[in-house]
Each structure stands twice: as C-alpha cells, then as structure tokens.
Amino acid sequence: MTLKNKSIVVLLSGGLDSSTVTSIAKKSEAKIFGLSFDYGQRHKKELHSASTIAKHFDIQEFKIIKLDLSLWGGSSLTDTKKNIPTEGVQTNKIPNTYVPGRNTIFISVALSYAEAIDADFIGLGVNALDYSGYPDCRPDYIKKFQELADLANKRGRENNPIKLWTPLLDLNKEQIIQLAMDNHVPLDKTWSCYSGDAKPCGKCDSCRIRNTAYKKWLNNKNKK
C-alpha cells in the first residue's frame, strides 16, 4: 500500500499513537487532513496537543469537531462523577474509561469527511496489543467497519473504497515509541493521560501503558 500523493484523513487525538500515524503518513508524502473531536472529554488538553502535532508536521488541514458525548456520559472520560481507574489494566474486563460508541462515531464522521474531499484513506492509531481492551480497537472491529464503509458510501459502491489504514494495529507500545522516535514525533508535545490535570497523572491505564513501554524502550536503547 502506497500513500505517496494520496489524501488521508487521520483521526488525530494528540496522543502517542495518532501522532505516530501522522508521522508515518507525512514520511510517506501523503496529503494529510487531521480530524480531532471535542467530545466533552475531561482531558481536553489533548486537543492542544493535536493542534501542535498538526502544525509540527505541516499537514494540509486540521479540524476540531464539536460533538458532546458528555450529554449522556457512560464513561469516566465524559462524566466527572465517575472515577478514572488507577489499579492497572484488568484482564478480560473493559474499564470505565471506554466511551460508548466513540470510535464508531469518530470513524463514521471521518468517513463522511473523507468522501466529501475524495480522500483515499482514513488513518487510525488503534492498537490491539498494549491497550485497555476496548472493543472498538480490535482487528475484527476494523475488518467489520471496513465492510460497512464499503457498503455505506458512494465510492464503496463504485468499487473505489476508502480504506481504513491501521499501521500500528499489530505493534506493541515499545515498537510504537521506536517508530515515533524514528519519525521525529515530539513526544513531549503529545498527551496520553486521561486526567484533566496540567501534568500527566502517571496512574491511569494510558499513563501506565505508555510509561512502562518508554522504560522498556529506554532500557533496550541503553543496552545497545
């Protein structure tokens, strides 16, 4: 799959994964259209990071869509009455940081945007190895959404489908950090923490996964 001179809509949250996807697309000489969402999340700082990453990689266009999922809550990320779990990733248990239908909604909006501007791909930072177990980050979900996308829009019906591009799907977090380093992602400008504080909490799942991977990456780097 070549991205050179192709148009791609990247769901850019400002975190490590989506920033790395943006860097890969940039290195591949794609025309990048960044899309982020102000969805009532408590960690709105990620929107500033997304804007910073968009400017860093000088992408074609960057939009922030207002879509308030906090109106019905259902997640500790959109309902401040719920506590963000800090006990670490639980096996076979989906944490309350899961936002009901979030990826389905976001990818659907990205699909509409991509079709409107005649983009060829939608870039997603989903990762099925070092993650919190969200159902909408899994390979089978991506496969089924691609089938839906092919049926649900004009380009799909004309046998010129918009493809979901998930370059990080089978990578662990340590490998993603290495890729980010190779592609000059300013990691200090990205935001992964679920809390709405000024600095990363270091306790939520997202912080734990990222920090553990970074320590492994640093340890391996120092061994070389």
From Swiss-Prot:
Residues noted as binding ATP in the record, renumbered to the chain: 12-22
Binding sites annotated in the UniProt record for Zn(2+): 193, 201, 204, 207
Required cofactor(s): Zn(2+)
Disulfide bonds listed in the record: none
Biochemical pathway: Purine metabolism; 7-cyano-7-deazaguanine biosynthesis
Coiled coil: none
First-tier enzyme category under EC: ligase
Note on cofactor: Binds 1 zinc ion per subunit.
Keyword flag Translocase: no
InterPro entries tied to this protein: QueC, Rossmann-like_a/b/a_fold
Catalyzed reactions: 7-carboxy-7-deazaguanine + NH4(+) + ATP = 7-cyano-7-deazaguanine + ADP + phosphate + H2O + H(+)
UniProt GO MF annotations: ATP binding; ligase activity, forming carbon-nitrogen bonds; zinc ion binding
Pfam families cross-referenced by the UniProt entry: QueC
EC number per UniProt: 6.3.4.20
One GO-annotated biological process of the protein: queuosine biosynthetic process
Keywords carried by this UniProt record: ATP-binding, Ligase, Metal-binding, Nucleotide-binding, Queuosine biosynthesis, Zinc
Assigned protein family: Belongs to the QueC family.
Annotated NCBIfam families: 7-cyano-7-deazaguanine synthase QueC
Function: Catalyzes the ATP-dependent conversion of 7-carboxy-7-deazaguanine (CDG) to 7-cyano-7-deazaguanine (preQ(0)).
Protein name (Swiss-Prot/TrEMBL): 7-cyano-7-deazaguanine synthase
Name of the encoding gene: queC
